[in-house]
Each structure stands twice: as structure tokens, then as C-alpha cells.
Curated annotation (Swiss-Prot):
A GO BP entry: cell division
Coiled-coil annotated spans: 4-99
Source lineage: Eukaryota, Metazoa, Chordata, Craniata, Vertebrata
GO cellular component term, pick one: cleavage furrow
Name recorded for this polypeptide: Fibronectin type III and SPRY domain-containing protein 1
Location of Omega-N-methylarginine modifications: 310, 320
Length: 496
């Protein structure tokens, strides 16, 4: 019966996941239908605008060239008409002079003939006909205004839609996730020398499968990539996966996005559990600050809260959500998990296997600071490193500066400069807890033991503050040092 019930649960889970997948695909199809309508309308409007622009250019060219013909015709007509008028006047003058000469010649016996002949001779000398050029000032040839648009017509007939680059193909085998960096490699399915650049988009997600259309996280965009690979650096992996897609662009248009891919981004992500903190510690997500008045203020707030009563969380609020299997449930509201001189706060996520890494930066002026791990059984009054349930590195700046490793009330003084940022690497199954200078990755100390219970990140501070960085992968340099045995074995013999 139990097996059938379990099998039915699996079927229900499978069907629910499949239904969600189909619903997401239906939503995608509906969105694509809307996009087809909107995009086709847009490209149609763009096409009409481009042709209208061509028509306008052709019309402007036509008007300009017609104006040139009209101006040339008017100029030549003016010159020829002026020349024609001058020739007509010269001809009339010449004909009058010819008639006078004929008449004078017929009256040779008259006494005034010599004088008349002399006047005719002088008139011929001054006649316009003999000063007139009989060559046309302009030509009637208009061949310089002829056109032949055969080549342009062929170009217009060759008009077509812009060539769109193919969608790239992301090469998962060559892509890499390491050191909180992602190197994405892709290739083009065919050779295209006209590609100008690529556009890469990525987003975070907690879903392993194909990227879903509905996501809370927006796509982040990186433009102007010239190579077929790109490395994203300095990422914080606060979700389990990342989606990636890339498209190619020429100087005119962008192609389709590649098939999106999902890469796992394993990292240790936790928050500081304010319900576990000492009342003198003011906790804000991943930051902690010592507050000398914290206890008194807390007592006042508690009394006010008791007087007003409590309000239940809404049914659908996160407060009623199912916690992660490794996420610790919230503790008591009175913030008395640690008290007296145990100025401690714990992380909210259990470590029960695998390798994990996180970093913490503390205020150098803090009088005391400690970082490490602890079992959940760590007592209210117990300080980090003073019982068998906790391991830590401790910095003391009060009265006398000391830098020590502590476990089970045993102390080892560390001969190393105190960094302002510490890296913590926990390999649960190997029983290794190593501390590093977060900047140089120099090993400061390594505990070698056998963890018998799940662990929690643990911190302590007195008269100071610190900031935790999570969502980090185990650095490659740390893995390399561990494999090469760089962590000194002799430093652990007194602290196991």
C-alpha cells in the first residue's frame, strides 16, 4: 500500500510538472501570436515608409532634373532669340543699303553721284551686317541632358529584404562555470563575414529545465561582443541556475536568439538568522553590528509587542511557506538563542555534505571577532571555539592583539598577518575546515576532524561589525591547494 501511495505521489508530481510545462508553452504560443501580429504590422509600416522615402527621393530627383532641362532650354532660347533679333536687324539694314546702292548706280550721270557713292561706301563700312558673327552662340544639341537609368533600374529591381544573421549555437561542452565566473562559448551554424557583433543576455533562475517565459528575474544584456565567447566575472550565485541566450547582428539588423541554455551555478547561499543572534547584535540580512543598547531596546520592544498582541501571517504569505530542507526554521522570537558573553549569530542553512565556501569582512577596529562553524547543539552561553561543538578563527584587538584558531577550548596562535577579509572553506565529508586570506588565498589554518552532525556557519563580534558574502563557489585556487596538500597538517594536531 505504501509503495502504491509513493508511486501515485510520483505520478502526481510528474503530471503537475508536465502541466506546468504545457501551460508555460501555451502562454509562449499565445505571446508569439501577439508578437507575429505586432511585428508584421511594424515591418509592413517600415516597408511602406522605406518605399515612400524612395518615391520622395525619385520625385525630388525628377523635379531637379526637369528644372535643369527647363533652365537650359530657357537660357539657349534667350541667346538664340537675341542673336536672331540682331541678325534680323542687320539684314534689314543691309537690304536698305543694297537698295540705295542700286538706285545710286542707276543714276551715275547725276552731279551728286560721287558724294552719294561715298556715303554708300561709308554706310557699308559701318553696316551691322559686317560686324555680326554668323556663328550661333549656343548649340541646339541637348544630349548632355540625356539619361539612362538602366543600371539604377536593375538596382531597384534587386531590392529585397535585409539578410538576417543565423541564430548562434551555444557550445555547452566548451562553456564553463567556475570561480563565480561563467564563460559562454558559441559558434555560427554557417560562415557569415558580415556579422558585426553579438548580444548576450542572461538571467538567474531556480528552475533547472528550459528557460521559462514567465520569470521574476529580468534578462541582463551585454552588447557589442566581437568574439564568439564571453566571460561574466564577479557574479553572485544566489540562485541555482542561470539562463543564457545570444544573437548575432550585422550593421543593419539582429538575428534570432540562439536556443536558450540553462547552466547550473552551484554555490553556498545562506542568510544570517536574526532569531539566533545575541540581543546585543543588530542583524541586517548579511551584516551584523554590535549594539551595546540592544538588550534594553529589545526588552522595551518586547513589552510593547506583548501589549499590542500578535497578528497572524496571511495564508499565502512567505511566513507560511514550506522551508528548504536545509534551511533552519526560525527560532524563538525573544532572541535569546545566545546570551551572556556568547555574542554569536548563526547562518540559516545547514551544511551536511559537500564543499562550501563563504567570506566575511570585519571592521578592523572591532575589539573581538570570530568566524567558523558550529553544531546546532551549541549552548546558549557557549562561545565559539570553547566547546567541542564549534571551530573558529578568532581575532582579539582588546588590550593585546591576538590571532588564534580555537576548538574545544584549545587555542593555537597563528603566525600570520591578520587579513581584513577571511575566506572559509568547509569540506564536510573530508572533515576539513580551512581558513584563508580571502584576497591572496593564503592558507591561515586548517582543522582536520570528523563532523558527526550537520554544521551551521557561525560568527561572533564584540564592539564591532562584519559583513558576510555568500553565493560564492569554492575558488579553483582553494581546490588546488587542498589537492596538493598545501594546508599544513602539523597545524592541526592540537586542535582536532
Amino acid at each position: 500500500m505504501e509503495e502504491q501511495r509513493e508511486a501515485l505521489r510520483k505520478i502526481i508530481t510528474t503530471l503537475a510538472m508536465k502541466n506546468e510545462e504545457i501551460q508555460s508553452f501555451i502562454y509562449s504560443l499565445k505571446q508569439m501570436l501577439l508578437n507575429v501580429e505586432a511585428n508584421s504590422t511594424k515591418v509592413q509600416e517600415d516597408l511602406e515608409a522605406e518605399f515612400q522615402s524612395l518615391f520622395s527621393v525619385l520625385e525630388e530627383l525628377k523635379e531637379g532634373m526637369l528644372m535643369k532641362i527647363k533652365q537650359d532650354r530657357a537660357s539657349r532660347t534667350y541667346e538664340l532669340q537675341n542673336q536672331l533679333a540682331a541678325c534680323t536687324r542687320a539684314l534689314e539694314s543691309s537690304e536698305e543699303l543694297l537698295e540705295t546702292a542700286n538706285q545710286t548706280l542707276q543714276a551715275m550721270d547725276r552731279e551728286d553721284f560721287p558724294q552719294a557713292a561715298k556715303q554708300i561706301k561709308d554706310g557699308v563700312t559701318m553696316a551691322p551686317a559686317f560686324r555680326l558673327s554668323l556663328k550661333a552662340k549656343v548649340s541646339d544639341n541637348m544630349s548632355h541632358l540625356m539619361v539612362d537609368f538602366a543600371q539604377e533600374r536593375q538596382m531597384l529591381q534587386a531590392l529585397k529584404f535585409l539578410p538576417v544573421p543565423s541564430a548562434p549555437v551555444i557550445d555547452l561542452a566548451e562553456s564553463l562555470v567556475a570561480d563565480n565566473c561563467v564563460t559562454l562559448v558559441w559558434r555560427m551554424p554557417d560562415e557569415d563575414s558580415k556579422i558585426d557583433h553579438y548580444v548576450l543576455e542572461y538571467r538567474r533562475t531556480n528552475f533547472e529545465g528550459p528557460p521559462r517565459l514567465k520569470e521574476d528575474q529580468p534578462w541582463m544584456v551585454i552588447e557589442g561582443i566581437r568574439q564568439t565567447e564571453y566571460t561574466l566575472t564577479g557574479l553572485k550565485f544566489d540562485m541555482k541556475y542561470m539562463n543564457f541566450r545570444v544573437k548575432a547582428c550585422n550593421k543593419a539588423v539582429a538575428g534570432e536568439f540562439s536556443e536558450p541554455v540553462t547552466l547550473e551555478t552551484p554555490a553556498f547561499m545562506f542568510r544570517l538568522d536574526a532569531s539566533t543572534s545575541h540581543q546585543n547584535l543588530r542583524v541586517d540580512d548579511l551584516s551584523v553590528e554590535w549594539d551595546a543598547m540592544g538588550g534594553k531596546v529589545q526588552d522595551i520592544k518586547a513589552r510593547e509587542k506583548d501589549g499590542k498582541g500578535r497578528t497572524a501571517s496571511p495564508i499565502n504569505s512567505p511566513a507560511r511557506g514550506t522551508p528548504s530542507p536545509k534551511r533552519m526554521p526560525s527560532g524563538r522570537g525573544g532572541r535569546d538563542r545566545f546570551t551572556a558573553e556568547s555574542y554569536t549569530v548563526l547562518g540559516d542553512t545547514l551544511i551536511d555534505g559537500g564543499e562550501h565556501y563563504w567570506e566575511v569582512r570585519y571592521e578592523p577596529d572591532s575589539k573581538a571577532f570570530g568566524v567558523g562553524v558550529a553544531y546546532r547543539s551549541l549552548g546558549r552561553f557557549e562561545q565559539l571555539g570553547k566547546t567541542a561543538a564549534s571551530w573558529c578563527l578568532h581575532v582579539n584587538n582588546w588590550l593585546q592583539v591576538s590571532f588564534t584558531a580555537k576548538h574545544a577550548n584549545k587555542v593555537k596562535v597563528l603566525d600570520a598577518p591578520v587579513p581584513d577579509c577571511l575566506g572559509v572553506h568547509c569540506d564536510f565529508h573530508q572533515g576539513l575546515l580551512s581558513f584563508y586570506n580571502a584576497r591572496t588565498k593564503q592558507v591561515l589554518h586548517t582543522f582536520k576532524t570528523r563532523f558527526t552532525q550537520p554544521l551551521l556557519p557561525a560568527f561572533t563580534v564584540w564592539c564591532g561589525s562584519f559583513q558576510v558574502t555568500t553565493g560564492l563557489q569554492v575558488p579553483s585556487s582553494v581546490r588546488c591547494l587542498q589537492k596538493r596538500g598545501s594546508a599544513t597538517s602539523s597545524s592541526n594536531t592540537s586542535l582536532t
